A protein has these predicted regions:
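Carbohydrate-interacting/catalytic domains
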Residues: 2, 7-16, 21-238
């Protein structure tokens, strides 16, 4: 335990990073009771025999960690609202029968180049971007209907310094407007995640929350140290 505000702020951010990684991953998200309250078991990952404060859920912590509870609720709502995060089939990395002719998933380096084997095996790489295509969901809905969703870009920066990402204009449907809906490095990490937030320039520092850029030109965002930024693409009408 520590009273150092910088250390505690970093720990809180890392908690948000792990939760965001969980909720925006495919498969069933698994939470241990109390994760949404900041319950850590004091680092004990095998506490089955600890019938004491290590393993008990301290419900009084709910008031102290209300912001974390709200963050988890917002992530859960976003996941529930967007089937691209709940696919029942594996990604193929191919176009398949996507409406827009783009692949279902693309992995990029911060400079905007598609990742290759060397990038994946690099020992010093601490940042990447993943783009998931909402028009490339291959499984049908419960009535056999086609499932479509928004496109998403997830920027991950595990570095101790800020990293600038460049996403090529070819990502997403032509004319797509990108909105930052989650920024774990922000004091309000999900402001605007469910309701649009005021526009915020991506060229003047951190990612911010709100409108980040339009399709047709490269998207440039600076992601804070040890932070995750999620962008949702709004396709043009028609």
């Amino acid at each position: 335990p520590t009273d150092d505000p910088e250390i505690n702020a970093l720990r809180d951010r890392q908690v948000r990073n792990v939760l965001a990684t969980l909720f925006f991953s495919q498969g069933i998200p698994m939470l241990l009771a109390g994760d949404e309250l900041g319950r850590t078991q004091q680092g004990n990952n095998n506490s089955y025999c600890q019938d004491n404060e290590i393993s008990w859920v301290d419900w009084d912590a709910a008031a102290k960690h209300s912001d974390l509870i709200e963050f988890v609720a917002a992530l859960s709502a976003l996941r529930r609202a967007h089937p691209v995060f709940r696919r029942r089939r594996f990604f193929s990395g191919q176009t398949g029968d996507s409406v827009d002719g783009q692949r279902d998933i693309i992995w990029l380096t911060p400079s905007g180049h598609e990742m290759n084997a060397g990038d994946w095996n690099s020992g010093y790489a601490k940042a990447l971007a993943v783009c998931v295509n909402g028009d490339a969901i291959t499984e049908p809905g419960p009535r056999g209907e086609r499932i479509t969703d928004s496109d998403f870009i997830i920027l991950v920066n595990a570095h101790s310094e800020a990293v600038r990402f460049s996403v090529p204009a070819s990502i997403g449907s032509p004319g797509t407007a990108w909105q930052v809906i989650v920024d774990t490095g922000s004091p309000q990490p999900v402001a605007g995640a469910l309701d649009p937030a005021p526009a915020s320039s991506a060229e003047t520092g951190g990612a911010g929350l709100g409108s980040a850029g339009l399709g047709g030109s490269a998207l440039n965002l600076e992601v804070a140290p040890r932070a995750i930024v999620v962008l949702r693409g709004a396709k043009p009408a028609g």
